[in-house]
């Protein structure tokens, strides 16, 4: 590689790094993810996303206007062949506090899940419960997970297609027991950016042999759908994500979310909402391919 190529590659990476740091910083600010004095438990699986999250959090920590701690935690689920030395060695090079939590959830998953069935659901529940308990043990105030924008959009479609629910992943949530706050600092980051970032940083990626190789997973088909959309219509994934941020309960059909039964009439004839809707429709570039031809039905 000549000097011109090297200079160009460095420039592109610097732009990528700034974009990712800006996206993480904006997500943290928008959802008040990290506050003064927080102890952030960064959950590191060994995948590209959690490595990138840790790296960006540590960089933001140096320049943040508030003081907070970052503690790296890995859950060793006792998968056969798992390289136990990689993460401790990596954390040592960073000179940061870390813990390796030993919990044989692998055997439980293999015992409970029939052959050929997806293991991700039970695996994630067991992992989540263990991490919640450990966070309390070390006094962590926030649990940081490495889910990104693509994960959030994929989850929404998974719930729509296979659960008949309009539900995704929130950037910040309180656990069911009310004792933990989970944050997703990569909420505004695209997976394709994280892939490039991880390649350049040469993180010691550890593949998940328990579930990552199951190509027939429902999530994989949805991921492929989004990748195809990205190629044909750049920006569509971002637009879908923005729609998750801009919900109009009265324009859906959930009777628990909006009181359709007792819908009051506006006797004053206020047409502001209707006029706004008309303005939006008239000023929006509508993708005509999304319409259905009903003339021959």
From Swiss-Prot:
GO terms assigned for molecular function: 4 iron, 4 sulfur cluster binding; ATP binding; magnesium ion binding; sulfurtransferase activity; tRNA binding
Co-factor note (free text): Binds 1 [4Fe-4S] cluster per subunit. The cluster is chelated by three Cys residues, the fourth Fe has a free coordination site that may bind a sulfur atom transferred from the persulfide of IscS.
Cofactor: Mg(2+); [4Fe-4S] cluster
Motif (PP-loop motif): 45-50
Coiled-coil zones: none
Pathway of action: tRNA modification
Locations listed in the record: Cytoplasm
Gene Ontology cellular-component terms listed: cytoplasm
The enzyme's E.C. designation: 2.8.1.-
Catalytic activity: cytidine(32) in tRNA + S-sulfanyl-L-cysteinyl-[cysteine desulfurase] + AH2 + ATP = 2-thiocytidine(32) in tRNA + L-cysteinyl-[cysteine desulfurase] + A + AMP + diphosphate + H(+)
HAMAP family: TtcA
Miscellaneous comment: The thiolation reaction likely consists of two steps: a first activation step by ATP to form an adenylated intermediate of the target base of tRNA, and a second nucleophilic substitution step of the sulfur (S) atom supplied by the hydrosulfide attached to the Fe-S cluster.
Protein family according to the UniProt entry: Belongs to the TtcA family.
Free-text function comment from the UniProt entry: Catalyzes the ATP-dependent 2-thiolation of cytidine in position 32 of tRNA, to form 2-thiocytidine (s(2)C32). The sulfur atoms are provided by the cysteine/cysteine desulfurase (IscS) system.
Name this protein carries in UniProt: tRNA-cytidine(32) 2-sulfurtransferase
């Amino acid at each position: 590689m000549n000097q011109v190529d090297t200079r160009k590659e460095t420039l592109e990476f610097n732009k990528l790094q700034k974009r990712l740091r800006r996206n993480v910083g904006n997500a943290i600010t928008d959802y008040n993810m990290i506050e003064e004095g927080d102890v952030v438990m960064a959950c590191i699986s060994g995948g590209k996303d959690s490595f990138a999250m840790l790296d960006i959090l540590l960089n933001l920590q140096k320049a943040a206007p508030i003081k907070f701690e970052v503690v790296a935690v890995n859950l060793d689920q006792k998968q056969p062949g798992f390289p136990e030395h990689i993460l401790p060695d990596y954390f040592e090079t960073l000179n940061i506090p870390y813990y390796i939590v030993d919990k044989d959830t692998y055997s439980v998953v293999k015992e409970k899940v029939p052959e050929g069935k997806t293991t991700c659901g039970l695996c994630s529940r067991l992992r989540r419960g263990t991490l919640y308990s450990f966070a309390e043990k070390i006094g962590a105030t926030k649990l940081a997970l490495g889910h990104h924008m693509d994960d959030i959009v994929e989850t929404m479609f998974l719930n729509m297609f296979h659960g008949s629910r309009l539900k995704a992943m929130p950037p910040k949530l309180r656990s069911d027991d009310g004792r933990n706050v989970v944050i997703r600092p990569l909420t505004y980051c695209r997976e394709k950016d994280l892939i490039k970032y991880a390649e350049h940083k040469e993180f010691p990626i550890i593949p998940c042999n328990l579930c990552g190789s199951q190509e027939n997973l429902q999530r994989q088909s949805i991921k492929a759908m989004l990748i195809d959309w990205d190629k044909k219509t750049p920006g569509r994934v971002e637009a879908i994500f923005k729609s998750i941020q801009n919900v109009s309960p009265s324009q859906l059909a959930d009777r628990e979310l909006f009181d359709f039964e007792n819908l009051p009439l506006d006797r004053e004839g206020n047409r502001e909402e209707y006029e706004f809707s008309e303005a939006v429709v008239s000023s929006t570039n509508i993708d005509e391919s999304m319409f259905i031809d009903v003339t021959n039905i």
